[in-house]
Amino acid sequence: MKTLITAIVAVLATATVAQAQSAPDLKGAWSGKFRTVILGSNPHHPSSGAADAPRVREITFTFDIEGQDGRLLWGKSWSNPERKEPFVATVTADGRTIIGADTDGSLTMRIGGRSRMDACYVHPATGPSQSIVASCGALQRAR
């Protein structure tokens, strides 16, 4: 009996480790509506001046995951197809959470199934534009 329990525990532990190390195939375009608050101006969110009051916008945001190596992802993201930015990300050990960064901000995503992810993006006023952005939305995989 002790041998059987040990064998079952070993099989379950191996399955859990394998599951934590693998990630679903996420390559392709993911797009959706995001509610965004912007303080200041930048190329993605132009305004009449850098000292503007916070503005709320609804935008369509796209992540094109061009490559994947296990839990590592990379590609381009944009709210304006003329201003695509590179990003890199990784799926965490839970197999559902993604964290990453682009040239001036960071993103957190949660995989909700084969064709849905929830995502949030922020960037601080450390870049040349000195703008601050926070945005969240739901992404659908393009068919």
State the predicted function of each range.
Residues 26, 59-61, 135:
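Residues that flank catalytic or metal-binding motifs in active/ligand-binding sites
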Residues 22-24, 31-47, 90-143:
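Beta-sheet ligand-binding and adhesion/scaffold domains
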Residues 16-20:
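Sec/Tat signal peptide C-region and signal peptidase I cleavage site
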Residues 29-33, 62-64, 74-76, 118-120:
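Beta-strand secondary-structure signal
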